Amino acid sequence: YFDHCIGRIIDRLEEKGLRDNTLIVYASDHGEMLYKNGICEKHTFFEDAVAIPLIFSMPGRLPTNAVSEAMVSNIDLMPTLLRFLDVPVPNFVEGRDLAPTFTGSEVQEHVFAEYYHSLDPCRMVRDKRYKYIHTEEDICELYDLDNDPLESINLAWYPQYTDRINRMEELAMKGWEIPRIPLWAPWNDLNERK
């Protein structure tokens, strides 16, 4: 049904002669666990929750029917959209322009994600093979996504991964400022009532 609705929008743009100068972006803020690993909510770093769709379409400005396995982040949407509009990207804007990724000339080696749930901030860094997760309690997890796609074996317990953990922890923690949220934050009270 959703594809059909998007198709209707594209058909209307074509009817009005607007398709060639309209950038279409489809994205999501999180994936869906659908009870995989026994989880049905979004507050997790399992791949099913953090791997999200991202589609950019604009005839003449972007390759047609191209598919990429490049890792990108939603934080990259704003600078990318500003560049498409030929608007200067302010210095305070985080993220990077994805245009080089669209052409394959530049691909990010790492992507990051973070969340703050019930006052427990967590951060994740991922490369093509490994995923590292760090919590405020200094608990870490490391998963080999090639050999353990279900993320069931935490390699952080194995000494042979110490160097990788140290490198990924440095990446994850670089520049991360954990906000101090008051204990009385209203959403915390609601979370505790579950």
Regions found by a protein language model. Name each.
Residues 1-3:
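Outer-membrane beta-barrel transmembrane strands
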Residues 5-12, 80:
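Short, conserved SAM-binding segment of the class I
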Residues 11-63, 73:
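Histidine-centered active-site microenvironments of extracellular/periplasmic hydrolases
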Residues 30-36, 75-78, 83-145, 150, ...:
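C-terminal cap/loop subdomain of S1 sulfatases and analogous C-terminal strand-loop tails that border
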Residues 33, 45, 54, 67, ...:
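Conserved beta-strand positions that form and line the central face of beta-propeller blades
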Residues 41, 61-72, 85-89, 152-161:
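Active-site rim elements
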Residues 53, 57, 170-180:
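A short, conserved beta-to-alpha structural element at the edge of catalytic cores
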